[in-house]
């Protein structure tokens, strides 16, 4: 069965071009969430286990126990220990409402008017809608921030958390969001990106030993395990940075809806 959709002209980006683009992208995501708030739909073909962080952490612990002779066991085991210790510190995200969200809000799932300003700061639509499903909002927004706020991407051992991009995205989201967020739901927005980075680090670390799921770059790495270990360490690096930046991120989340977007002069050219 094929699904026919109207073609949307536009330009996609693999990395955020600056705070103004992040503000606009987050505003579009907020409008998407708000528009679907009253949707009553029986979803079929849902991806099981998506963002089931406890399951991913348990899987990592299991694979560390099962493959003690793997060539990468020692660094993966050290990372797994750090991940488990941090998970025990983070506030649990239990009991939050499941809202209809995109499910994969990375930047290249948003189309923009053009490649250059001001068009690159004018989002047209979200694409790749097969992941749309109910999910707690903090995990959706956390996944977006994980993707947008690390200009070094997923294939480097050391990440770089871009606080300006984060703050612009939060301001754009809050300005456009019309959802009636409960106090605990809004408070949990602070911790979504912490959990998501931890979860993805655990997933990459597990596959560094299993070498079964994620693809890998044969031009840069000798095998899948080495590539996935770099990815796992990169997400741990990003997690450490967003965890350390929690006070600053909390200030951004307390921002007043309707804040002016950042100047496009901050966009990378």
List the predicted regions and their residue ranges.
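A conserved loop-to-beta-strand element in the N-lobe of protein kinase catalytic cores
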Residues: 1-5
């Amino acid at each position: 069965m094929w699904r026919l959709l109207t073609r949307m002209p536009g330009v996609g980006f693999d990395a955020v071009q600056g705070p103004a683009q992040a503000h606009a992208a987050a505003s579009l995501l907020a409008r998407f969430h708000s528009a679907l708030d009253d949707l009553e739909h029986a979803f079929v073909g849902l991806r099981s286990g998506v963002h089931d962080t406890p399951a991913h952490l348990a899987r990592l612990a299991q694979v560390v126990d099962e493959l003690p002779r793997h060539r990468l066991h020692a660094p993966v085991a050290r990372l797994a220990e750090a991940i488990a210790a941090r998970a025990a510190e983070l506030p649990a995200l239990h009991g939050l409402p499941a809202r209809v969200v995109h499910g994969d809000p990375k930047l290249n799932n948003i189309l923009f008017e053009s490649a250059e300003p001001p068009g690159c700061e004018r989002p047209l639509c979200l694409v790749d809608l097969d992941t749309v499903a109910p999910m707690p909002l903090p995990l959706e927004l956390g996944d977006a921030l994980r993707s947008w706020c690390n200009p070094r991407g997923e294939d480097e051992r050391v990440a770089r958390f871009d606080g300006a991009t984060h703050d612009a995205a939060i301001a754009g989201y809050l300005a456009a969001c019309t959802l009636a967020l409960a106090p605990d739901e809004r408070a949990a927005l602070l911790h979504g990106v912490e959990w998501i980075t931890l979860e993805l680090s655990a997933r990459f670390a597990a596959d560094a030993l299993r070498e079964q799921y994620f693809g890998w770059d044969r031009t840069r790495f000798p095998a899948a395990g080495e590539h996935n270990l770099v990815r796992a360490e990169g997400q741990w690096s990003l997690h450490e940075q967003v965890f350390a930046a929690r006070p600053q991120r909390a200030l951004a989340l307390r921002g007043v809806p309707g804040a002016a977007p950042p100047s496009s002069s901050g966009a990378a050219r």
